Amino acid sequence: MDLYLQVSLASSKLLTKAYSTSFSLGIRTLDEKVHDPIYAIYGFVRLADEIVDTFHDQDKAALLQRFREDTYRAIEEKISLNPILHSFQWAVNKFG
C-alpha cells in the first residue's frame, strides 16, 4: 500500500473517530480486514452529511454537486487529492 493511500485511510479513520466514537467502537468488533474500507465509506458519507447539516451560509446545492462530480472523477481516475475521496475511491474500486 502506497504512502498516500495510507495517509488517506488514516484521515478517514481520524474523521470517523472525531465524529462518532460509538461507530468507531463498533468497527473494532469486526474483522480487521474490513476496518479500512468501512472507515473510507464512513468518511465519505460524513463529508456529504457535513455539507447538508453544517454549511448553512454556503450554497449547499453547488457544494453537493461539486462533491458528486469530484467523487465520480476520483472513482474513474482512481485518485483524488482530497484524502477522504481518495480512500473512498480505493474502497469502491477494490470492493465495489
Regions found by a protein language model. Give the residues of each.
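Acidic catalytic motifs of isoprenoid enzymes
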Residues: M1-G96
